[in-house]
């Protein structure tokens, strides 16, 4: 029996090997792949048990669940890769409910011919991101498709967390007079991915803002949870899509100030060069919070005190508007309607 186990666990040739169809066929090669890359990267008691599912205990409160898929191109970009993005994005979706993320799952669809060294790099960084966040990946799946039927690797995730009783953040809860706060500069992720995709170089390196926001959210809830109406992470479609979604769901309008919106000069310059509206550009480490006016100062102070919130700003207010428009006062003193993005400005950004 020991000889069989030893033979079964032969090491992968990660440096030179590539994915082939046998790695998804359920046999020895698949076992070697799971042991040699995924279990090594995500190592924890649940995965070591070798079951097709994981059992876990949860604390009191309301359970929150999310699921997401990641198809970003390129797979590696300044500030992260598809693996770190999958961990951070799933954690953030849970955190936007004011919940504490507890567990993740991850499923990989891998194209035949994909280099094992790249898969190991993705898995290792994904494991490191989950450990840094304190949210383990406790179950998963691997499938392999024929060459040309995918683009390297796609990742699907799910996450589970717990929201404390009494905290009910909903996208239909914005009310006229509420403050609109963003936790930092906009557009970093979308521009970082786009510049890598198009092989563009700028005088200053632009890196993705991909980060797990649950620690920041916990500080915000502690400082003024009773006053927070809702939180959203402005990913695809940027803050323009996020504000329009909230306006439609809450049946209100927004009035925001362009000069108050934080944005790095190099990101602004890159957007101008690429012909992008930064309001439509994706973010992966920022949040938008709508807060009752009496709690805005306390929540903003809590964000500023966190390492991920140094550039946070109050950028506008909720207004009564039967048309549910998002209006912006421009830097020139004029006004414009910030509409939904038409078409696809940045495909496969996450």
Curated annotation (Swiss-Prot):
Its EC number is 4.2.1.-. Involved in the maturation of [NiFe] hydrogenases. Along with HypF, it catalyzes the synthesis of the CN ligands of the active site iron of [NiFe]-hydrogenases. HypE catalyzes the ATP-dependent dehydration of the carboxamido group attached to its C-terminal cysteine to a cyano group. Pathway: Protein modification; [NiFe] hydrogenase maturation. Modified by HypF, which adds a carboxamido group to the thiolate of the C-terminal cysteine, yielding a protein-S-carboxamide. The carboxamido group is then dehydrated by HypE itself to yield a protein-thiocyanate. The modification S-cyanocysteine is found at residue 350. It comes from the Bacteria. Belongs to the HypE family. Keywords: Lyase. It catalyses: C-terminal S-carboxamide-L-cysteinyl-[HypE protein] + ATP = C-terminal S-cyanate-L-cysteinyl-[HypE protein] + ADP + phosphate + H(+). PANTHER family: CARBAMOYL DEHYDRATASE HYPE, HYDROGENASE ISOENZYMES FORMATION PROTEIN HYPE. This is Carbamoyl dehydratase HypE. The keyword RNA-binding does not apply. The modification S-carbamoylcysteine is found at residue 350. The keyword Lyase applies. One of its GO terms (molecular function) is lyase activity.
